Amino acid sequence: MSFDIAKYPTLALVDSTQELRLLPKESLPKLCDELRRYLLDSVSRSSGHFASGLGTVELTVALHYVYNTPFDQLIWDVGHQAYPHKILTGRRDKIGTIRQKGGLHPFPWRGESEYDVLSVGHSSTSISAGIGIAVAAEKEGKNRRTVCVIGDGAITAGMAFEAMNHAGDIRPDMLVVLNDNEMSISENVGALNNHLAQLLSGKLYSSLREGGKKVFSGVPPIKELLKRTEEHIKGMVVPGTLFEELGFNYIGPVDGHDVLGLITTLKNMRDLKGPQFLHIMTKKGRGYEPAEKDPITFHAVPKFDPSSGCLPKSSGGLPSYSKIFGDWLCETAAKDNKLMAITPAMREGSGMVEFSRKFPDRYFDVAIAEQHAVTFAAGLAIGGYKPIVAIYSTFLQRAYDQVLHDVAIQKLPVLFAIDRAGIVGADGQTHQGAFDLSYLRCIPEMVIMTPSDENECRQMLYTGYHYNDGPSAVRYPRGNAVGVELTPLEKLPIGKGIVKRRGEKLAILNFGTLMPDAAKVAESLNATLVDMRFVKPLDEALILEMAASHEALVTVEENAIMGGAGSGVNEVLMAHRKPVPVLNIGLPDFFIPQGTQEEMRAELGLDAAGMEAKIKAWLA
C-alpha cells in the first residue's frame, strides 16, 4: 500500500526519530492518533500482530521523543508490540510487507535496522540483554542509555526475574518499562499515580532522597523511618514493593496512553542512576473497539475489513492439527480422570480452549514458564497422574534440561504434544519448529513419533499416552489436516513403520506430514514408499530390509537434516555396515526466514516438485 500523505499529515512529517524529535510536543497526541489509524489501515490489509501494537503507540512515541535513538538503545521484549516502532524508524512505507516473504521481519531484527538493538521473537529476554548492553555502555563511557520494554505476560517468566535480581546486585544505569495491559485502574487512582510518578521521578525528589540517605546514614532509626515513610507513601497507591525489593527504583503505575505525561516522566527518569522501573497501564487494542473487547482474537489477524468489526471466518474446511489434538484430549479426558493437560500460555494456539472449559480442574496454564511446565508435569507423573504438555516446538527448546533431567532420566510417563513442528510460516526464524527431532532424538529411551496424517496423529497421541516406560513425544505441524478417515483409537506397535507402496530400485523413507508430496514423488519415480512413523526407536529391521532390496534410499523430514531422522537412518546403516547410498531431504543448515509454508517449502525443495528434482539430480 502507498502512504497517503493527505490522510496522515503529521505522520508524513516523521520518517525517522530525528524528525520525530523536531515536532513540538503539542502535536504528539495528533501524531499518536494518526499512527494508530495507520497501523489499523496497514495491518488489516497485510495481516500481522495487531492488538499489542495499538496499545503501545503513545509509549513508542514518548520513548523515541525522549531518548536519542538509535544512539540510546531501546530493546523490545518479544516484539509483537513493535509495529509502531518500525513505522517511526524509517520503515513506515514498508509496513504493509511485514511477515511476508522478502518483507519486513515480524519482530525487531538486528539485520533490518540499527534501531533494532536485539533480535527477538521469544519472550522474556529483554532485561537480561539490556543489562549486558547497559554494562557495555558504561564501559564504553559515552553516556549511552538503555531501555527495555517488557509486557505483563513476559515479565512472569523466570528469566525476567533472574535478570532483575542480577540488576539489583550490580546496579547498571538502565530503565525497564513494564507495559501492563491486563489490569484497569480508575481515573482517580490513575491521575494520582500520574502526578506522584512525576514527583517521585523528578530531580528534586531524587536529590533529596539521596541526600537524606547520606545525612542520616549514621542515624539508623531516622534512616529507617525515612525509608518506611517513602514506602508508605508509595504503597498507598502503587504495587511496586516486589520491584523495589529486587533493587529497582519503582515509579508507577501511570497512564500509558497519556503521551505528554509519559514524556515528562521519562525525561525525569532518563538521568537517574541505577536500575529504574516504570510501570505503565495500557489497553491492548486501544483505539479499535473490537480489539479492545477481544484482544486475544485480535492479537494476530489475517487480512480483514476494519469497518466490519470482525475477522473473516474460516472456510469450514479441514480441521487443523491443533483441533485434532484438542478433540483427542477431550475424548481421552472424558474416559480417564488421571489425564492432566499443561500449556505455557498457548491455550488458543494449541487447541485447548474446549478442554479448559470442560475440564477446568485438570487444565493448567502455567503462563510463559516452559521450564516450570515440564517439571510440573514430572511432579504430576510422580504423583500417579498422566500429564500431557502441549507446547510449540520452538518453545520446547526453552525447557530442554527439564525434559532431560526431570523427566527422561527418571523415566516418567510424560507425553509431549509438540505443535508447530516444521515450517511455521510468517513468524520466521525465531518460530520455525526445525530442531525438535534433533534435540530429542539423542535423549535415551525417549519415544518420538511423526504422524503422516490426522488419523495417525490421534493414534500416536493415544499410543504415547498409554506408554508408561518413559517420556514420549508426538510432533505435528501448523495448518490443516489432510482429510483422511478417523478410525477407532488403538495403540501402535512401538518402533514399527509400514510400507505404503512397493516400487523398484529406490525407497523413500518418510517421517511425518510431508507424506502427500513424498507419495507423489514415489508414484512418479516408481519408488517404494515407507511411512516410518517412529523417529525413536527406529524400525531398524525395516530400514535394513529396504537397504537390502533397493539400490538407494531417500529420507524425508521437515526438521533440520543435521541430527534429524535421516541422520538416525544413516547411523543404523553404518552400524550394520550397509554402504547403501542415502539422500537426506530436510531443512538445510540455516535459520529459515519468513514466508508462507507453501512458499518456503517450494524454496527449500520440500514440495513434490522440489523433492523429485533433488532426487533426480542426486541419481544422475
Curated annotation (Swiss-Prot):
GO terms for molecular function: 1-deoxy-D-xylulose-5-phosphate synthase activity; magnesium ion binding; thiamine pyrophosphate binding. SUPFAM superfamilies: Thiamin diphosphate-binding fold (THDP-binding), TK C-terminal domain-like. Homodimer. It catalyses: D-glyceraldehyde 3-phosphate + pyruvate + H(+) = 1-deoxy-D-xylulose 5-phosphate + CO2. Keywords: Isoprene biosynthesis, Magnesium, Metal-binding, Thiamine biosynthesis, Thiamine pyrophosphate, Transferase. It comes from the Bacteria. This is 1-deoxy-D-xylulose-5-phosphate synthase. Thiamine diphosphate binds at H80, G121, H122, S123, G153, A154, N181, Y288, E370. Its EC number is 2.2.1.7. One of its GO terms (biological process) is thiamine biosynthetic process. Its cofactor is Mg(2+); thiamine diphosphate.
